[in-house]
Amino acid sequence: MMKAVQLCLSLAFLGIAAKPEFDAELAKRLGADERGMKMYVLCILKTGPKDAELKGKDRDEVFAGHFANIGRLADEGKLAVAGPFGKNDRSWRGLYIFNVPTVEEAEKLVVLDPAVKAGVFVYELTPWYGSAAMMTVTETHKRLQKPK
């Protein structure tokens, strides 16, 4: 009986530890290299020089444009992830992970953000090597967000 339990546990462990099946079509669609990774550009949005000056309706309009821009970039496949930082002592406000291979291409996108144009945010860009699966976040997020 004990040997049967050991055998069952061993087989269960082997099933858990089995390598996942490689999906060549998915890897190609997401632009993955042989490690399942790809180059992105990481953008840190920081508090800009005009942040404190923009108030009321003007601020609301800038942020409405900021969020619309995020949605557009995500829908176009140019943005893997975006989101705000919690309170911190670095003036970091948010991040973007752009699905573009160069800093120059990312800069062309970030300067279109209404909050950057208005001086609410300034930005820093750097190349970042991460999982190509990052490109599945937007679709998954849409299934998690409750409709308004």
Language-model segments: what does each one mean?
Residues 2-10:
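Sec-dependent signal peptide recognition
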Residues 10-18:
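Hydrophobic h-region of N-terminal signal peptides that target proteins for export
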Residues 18-148:
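Conserved, structured core segments of small domains
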